[in-house]
Curated annotation (Swiss-Prot):
Belongs to the ADP-ribosylglycohydrolase family. The keyword Cytoplasm applies. Required for myofibril assembly and outgrowth of the cardiac chambers in the developing heart. Appears to be catalytically inactive, showing no activity against O-acetyl-ADP-ribose. This is Inactive ADP-ribosyltransferase ARH2. PANTHER family: ADP-RIBOSYLGLYCOHYDROLASE (PTHR16222), INACTIVE ADP-RIBOSYLTRANSFERASE ARH2 (PTHR16222:SF23). GO terms for biological process: cardiac chamber ballooning; cardiac myofibril assembly; protein de-ADP-ribosylation. Disulfide bonds: none annotated. Its main location: cytoplasm. The gene is ADPRHL1. GO terms for cellular component: sarcomere. It holds the Pfam family ADP_ribosyl_GH. It comes from Pongo abelii (Sumatran orangutan). The modification Phosphoserine is found at residue 27.
Length: 354
């Protein structure tokens, strides 16, 4: 249970650290960000108070997803209606938090008063952003057991496409939910990427079964898989026999910036549903159990660092708990108690069958 609470909490810590960085228009290069951090005394001396270190829309939407998952729903359609209600309720809080534009657009298309079609939104050519990935980690906490894979796939796809009805967007939510479930199962980190890709065809089958936007999906489906396959080959972990990620000899902040931009589809690392989880995963592979190293790689770079920080922080919490993280980063965090309560509730529900 403690690690589930840590996952919810550190996802928000990663968000706050990365969001402060995104808000600083001049801090566009990882090296500068890290130098500034050192001048202020480093991570050990930071205290994340809500006024100085607010969270972004990533945490607000993640809390909304977790709140829906912890209600007493009878069937998945009821869960989706509850998600719609939660998202519509909090959407007015989002504009001041610099949200993923697709999140706002998607929430505007939700229909809480339409019982049958509440969560059915139109296909969105611009719905490929990170926002689906950063609100879905808790789905992996709720359905982490291997025998719940089918439910995890269905819920993460539906949750994702409520706001990001584009394969690059909603496959991001599948990816983060799966990664969290793998962490909860104790699956070796190096296997996560290839096991996630094995689940993508199951998501495609589910989408075909629901007969929504099949033609549009087919046109864009390949991109997410291709980007991830290239990444796994680059790190030499695409095959089952490969169990050690290989990093370049020189992979400092400047080199990472170039690499993150290369993985991106628009030159801003972590902006989309494929590369926000990718940067977080890459950071976890490199950092091991070092929270400081994880922050340098996932929370302090010139891209969409709030998104990558949210995902990386959540996964770190589930893998390693809170003990390796300075207390100042979470003792006064915005919505701390709510996050911990949701983590505890998700743990309890995930051990019961539903």
């Amino acid at each position: 249970m403690e690690k589930f609470k840590a996952a919810m909490l550190l996802g928000s810590v990663g968000d706050a650290l990365g969001y402060r960085n995104v808000c600083k228009e001049n801090s566009t290069v990882g090296m500068k960000i890290q130098e500034e951090l050192q001048r202020s005394g480093g991570l050990d001396h930071l205290v994340l108070s809500p006024g100085e270190w607010p969270v972004s829309d990533n945490t607000i939407m993640h809390i909304a997803t977790a709140e829906a998952l912890t209600t007493d729903y009878w069937c998945l359609d009821d869960l989706y209606r509850e998600m719609v209600r939660c998202y519509v309720e909090i959407v007015e809080k989002l504009p001041e938090r610099r949200p993923d534009p697709a999140t706002i657009e998607g929430c505007a298309q939700l229909k809480p008063n339409n019982y049958l079609l509440a969560w059915h939104t139109p296909f969105n050519e611009k719905g490929s952003g990170f926002g689906a990935a950063t609100k879905a980690m808790c789905i992996g906490l709720r359905y982490w057991k291997p025998e719940r894979l089918e439910t995890l796939i269905e819920v993460s796809v539906e949750c994702g496409r409520m706001t990001h009805n584009h394969p690059t967007g909603f496959l991001g939510s599948l990816c983060t939910a799966l990664f969290v479930s793998f962490a909860a199962q104790g699956k070796p980190l190096v296997q996560w990427g290839r096991d996630m890709l094995r689940a993508v065809p199951l998501a495609e089958e589910y989408c075909k079964k629901t007969i929504r936007h099949t033609a549009e999906y087919q046109e864009h489906w390949f991109y997410f898989e291709a980007k991830w396959q290239f990444y796994l080959e680059e790190r030499k972990i695409s095959k089952d026999s490969e169990n050690k990620a290989i990093f370049p000899d020189n992979y400092d902040a400047e080199e990472r910036e170039k690499t993150y931009r290369k993985w991106s589809s628009e030159g801003r690392g972590g902006r989309r549903g494929h590369d926000a989880p990718m940067i977080a995963y890459d950071a976890l592979l490199a950092a091991g159990n070092s929270w400081t190293e994880l922050c340098h790689r996932a929370m302090f770079h010139g891209g969409e660092s709030a998104a990558t920080g949210t995902i990386a922080g959540c996964l770190f919490g589930l893998l390693y708990g809170l003990d390796l993280v300075p207390k100042g980063l979470h003792q006064d965090l915005e919505d701390k108690e709510k996050l911990e309560d949701l983590g505890a509730a998700l743990y309890c529900l995930s051990t019961e069958e539903k």
